[in-house]
Amino acid sequence: MELSYRLFICLLLWGSTELCYPQPLRLLQGGTSHPETALQPVVVECQEATLVVTVSKDLFGTRKLIRAVDLTLGPEGCEPLVSTDTEDVVRFEVGLHECGNSMQVTDDALVYSTFLLHDPRPVGNLSIVRTNRAEIPIECRYPRRGNVSSQAILPTWLPFRTTVFSEEKLTFSLRLMEENWSTEKRTPTFHLGDVAHLQAEIHTGSHVPLRLFVDHCVATPTPDQNASPYHTIVDFHGCLVDGLTDASSAFQAPRPRPDTLQFTVDVFHFANDSRNMIYITCHLKVTLAEQDPDELNKACSFSKASNSWFPVEGPADICQCCSKGDCGTPSHARRQPHVVSLGSGSPARDRRHVTEEADVTVGPLIFLDRTGDHEMEQWALPADTSLLLLGTGLAVVALLTLTAVILVLTRRCRTASLPVSASE
């Protein structure tokens, strides 16, 4: 599936600026424009001989800032003016005949056409991006002016299933939750820029109190956790490394219970991959609740404010190894769960062998980025909604059938009464 979409903005100007958005713009003296509401994501000034384009770094309105290096103007890919990371906007200033802009002469206008391209690329050695590719056509007309509105397409995610591998008493689970963490998410649909709320749990039965840890998490386009491409979310025995880059992913502190661990992940899709499914596989493990967390059993998040790691519980120094990428013995990353004995030394026929570690997969998470994917959305309707639609359809068919029978019987009765009237 093509993971890109086109956001169309027509800019029809006469020596002034006017964005084609539902919000009206007031034209001021000097050929400038002023929105009546919030700052527009793209503002264009068609001047006498130059074209000035100002792009908000919050281009999609999701508070996920784009990078200036991912923006170009025109077929020749003109780069923006130099700006600092602290600025909220990216600016282009080019001549009307530069950057491969096209010119067309009509009966009543001189039309210059070009486009703004946002083409996100993975940061560093990562293989994921968190925003979509967008091509925004720009058009300047002289001397006419007008306004054409366009609404952005909102990419979405679609449903998921959960697969659990466990034995006997210990049951591991990984669920997608609502934002308030109170209930499981009923409609697993996301937009780029949203945050997925994941909750890992261990159901202990009659066992002694246990503490749950997420040792490793990896995202792949198939259920196979060893598939490629892949993106590591948690690594090094509990370091949430996804929060190191442009994401706000983090563990939630404090825990609701020792046997439950919650964390958030900024949603994403794989760059240059036609598959629109993402599976998240986490390796879960437990320790005794009374055991203090250490480098091998921890839950650490990265704080961009302090530029440091911090744990959900336990001393702060247990997270220092996250920066080094070495937290002791090799991680359980991308392998099957290990089975150990939690027996008490009783005779062999009474001993229990259960898993204190397990791989749990949540998926598929289906990412939609085109309005044409509504068929996928319909596939994700809840069971009760499908039954309601089926019942409504059957009721309509029954009503139409009953109406047809009544009409046929009425016509026959009228036909049978005609000879009697003639004899009289």
UniProtKB/Swiss-Prot annotation:
One of its GO terms (cellular component) is extracellular space. Disulfide bonds join C46-C140, C78-C99, C217-C282, C239-C300. The modification Pyrrolidone carboxylic acid is found at Q23. It is found in: Cell membrane. Its main location: membrane. Proteolytically cleaved before the transmembrane segment to yield the secreted ectodomain incorporated in the zona pellucida. This is Zona pellucida sperm-binding protein 3. It comes from Callithrix sp. (Marmoset). The gene is ZP3.
